[in-house]
């Protein structure tokens, strides 16, 4: 039996919750970004998080162990198939997860939804996500921005993570920045070293400004 959807009468805040989708390839730093965002924003905003894995709930466990949010505010979804499908073509499993979390926490300000690791073609359904953040990492090589794909060209914010690894993999950050601007036009991007918290404040500021949380 499906969990009940959020009842509008239970929500006391005027604005609906902001749904932020976080996507990107396996190992790019999606879960780390989600952890850092939760820790940076939890004192000011009411947060819940939903993670996607194909056959496990490992990302949910990692966030819980890291103390990103209280355990009851983190839900793991086992998609059992292509992670792209679960956030785009048939997002019903995630839409139901959002409803379940909002039935528990009706005054949530932000619902973070982390996709399972996927390729550069992954995008979020507009029914599921209001803002999309796509994470790639320098370890994949400086060519990654040039490869394009909806995640790189159409996401609301592109995060280029693991900048500290550039010297180790022979990647030129200036080239990556230039290619990113060519591929994205005026759409913003942030270079980060999430383990050192570098760039996290910029991502938070983007969410607050673009999501109108500061109004």
Swiss-Prot record:
The SS bond pairs are: none
Pfam families in the record: cobW (PF02492)
Any one cellular-component term (Gene Ontology): cytoplasm
Q: Which residues cross the membrane?
A: none
Record localization? Cytoplasm
**SUPFAM superfamilies, alphabetized:** P-loop containing nucleoside triphosphate hydrolases
The alphabetical list of record keywords is: Chaperone, Cytoplasm, GTP-binding, Nickel insertion, Nucleotide-binding
GO MF terms held by the record:
GTP binding; GTPase activity; nickel cation binding
**GO BP, one annotated term:** urea catabolic process
The residues that the entry says bind GTP are 24-31
Q: What does this protein do?
A: Facilitates the functional incorporation of the urease nickel metallocenter. This process requires GTP hydrolysis, probably effectuated by UreG.
Family indicated by similarity: Belongs to the SIMIBI class G3E GTPase family. UreG subfamily.
The record's note on quaternary structure and interaction partners says: Homodimer. UreD, UreF and UreG form a complex that acts as a GTP-hydrolysis-dependent molecular chaperone, activating the urease apoprotein by helping to assemble the nickel containing metallocenter of UreC. The UreE protein probably delivers the nickel.
Descriptive protein name: Urease accessory protein UreG
Record organism: Burkholderia ambifaria (strain MC40-6)
């Amino acid at each position: 039996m499906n969990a009940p959807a959020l009842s509008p009468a239970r929500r006391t805040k005027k604005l609906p919750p902001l749904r932020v989708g976080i996507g990107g390839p396996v190992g790019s730093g999606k879960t780390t970004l989600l952890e850092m965002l939760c820790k940076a924003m939890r004192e000011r905003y009411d947060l819940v998080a939903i993670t996607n894995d194909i056959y496990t709930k490992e990302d949910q466990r990692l966030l819980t162990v890291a103390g990103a949010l209280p355990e009851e505010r983190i839900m793991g979804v086992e998609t059992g198939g292509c992670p792209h499908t679960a956030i785009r073509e048939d997002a019903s499993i995630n839409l139901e997860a959002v409803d379940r979390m909002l039935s528990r926490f009706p005054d949530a300000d932000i619902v973070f939804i982390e996709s399972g690791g996927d390729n550069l073609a992954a995008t979020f359904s507009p029914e599921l996500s209001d803002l999309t953040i796509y994470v790639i990492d320098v370890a994949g090589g400086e060519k990654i921005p040039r490869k394009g794909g909806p995640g790189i060209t159409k996401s609301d914010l592109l995060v280029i993570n693991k900048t500290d690894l550039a010297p180790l993999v022979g990647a030129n950050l200036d080239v990556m920045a230039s290619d990113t601007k060519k591929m994205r036009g005026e759409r913003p991007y942030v270079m980060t070293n999430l383990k050192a918290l570098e760039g996290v404040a910029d991502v938070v500021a983007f969410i607050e400004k673009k999501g109108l949380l500061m109004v």
